[in-house]
Amino acid sequence: PANGVEKNQFLAKQALDLGCYGVVFPHISSVEEAYNAVAACRYARLKDKPLYEPQGIRGDGPMQACRYWGITQQEYYQRADVWPLAPHGEILTVIQIEDTMGIKNLRDILKNVPGIGAILIGEGDLSQELGYPRQTEHPVVLEAMAEIVAICKEMNVVVGHPHVEVSNAQR
């Protein structure tokens, strides 16, 4: 989908309605943007039901996803929720942290937005903002990426890196 601030929920809906098992939301920098990302992946539910927040805003229309998943629509509605918020959920909401504001707010995001399945480090844009474009081995960039990893470990959230090589796999 588009960047986090653009709130183009329809792009997440389209991907999920085609049968994708998750969506990566780039440039998430605030609690509000992260909440919108998770909400875009969830169907609405009654307020008195468990796991209400974040309130789902995904529109209906999963016929192709049901065919792709090989299940009925009713089964799809049961399983098409975000993991780990819904233990039975099979949709993964991944947010990409790509700037210093995202790093600054990451702890609050993970504390206040249930349903984020993983964090993906956006090293290219992060290195650009830090003044070292595509210098992903620069100490300043490495320090920023290490901070993301440390926060994710502290908050017990999976963190990923898009360009894993033998030389950086342990990071």
Predicted features along the sequence, with ranges:
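Expand to "…catalyze enediolate/carbanion chemistry for C-C bond making/breaking, isomerization
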Residues: 1-171
